[in-house]
Design a protein with these regions (language model features):
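Hydrophobic alpha-helical
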Residues: 1-34, 56
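Sec/Tat-exported extracytoplasmic proteins
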Residues: 2-5, 9, 40, 63-67, ...
């Protein structure tokens, strides 16, 4: 999306009042998070690719006739270019509201990530 926006002669960023287009993503790979640091993505919500092995384990338990918890949560984070937004409120699958912290991204955080 960023390439298409820039190819159209537009600018990505958080200054909406001056015509910038704010990009929010769910690509928390190193490349996606680098765009957060560079100010091209304002907020990046993690969709953890490391959950695959955990899901496979749960499927094997079900196939073996074992009981598993109805809800299984994935450890994920929300990263932002700055500290403007402290948290995001969302409703979970049980119709409960929950606050999710937003972490201002730093190079140190990016360097320590597995993907």
């Amino acid at each position: 999306a960023i390439d298409a926006i820039e190819a159209a002669g537009k600018t990505v960023g958080s200054d909406i009042a001056n015509g910038e287009i704010m990009v929010i993503s769910f690509d928390t790979t190193h490349a996606g998070l680098q765009d957060v640091l560079d100010g091209k993505i304002e907020c990046d919500v993690e969709c953890n690719p490391l959950h695959g092995p955990r899901a496979e384990e749960l499927i094997k338990k079900l196939e073996a006739g074992e009981d598993i918890d109805k809800l299984n949560y994935v450890d994920e984070e929300i990263f932002a270019h700055d500290d403007t937004v402290k948290s995001v409120k969302a409703t979970n699958s049980l119709d409960e509201e929950k606050d999710f912290d937003v972490t201002p991204l730093t190079q140190d955080i990016l360097d320590k990530r597995a993907y």
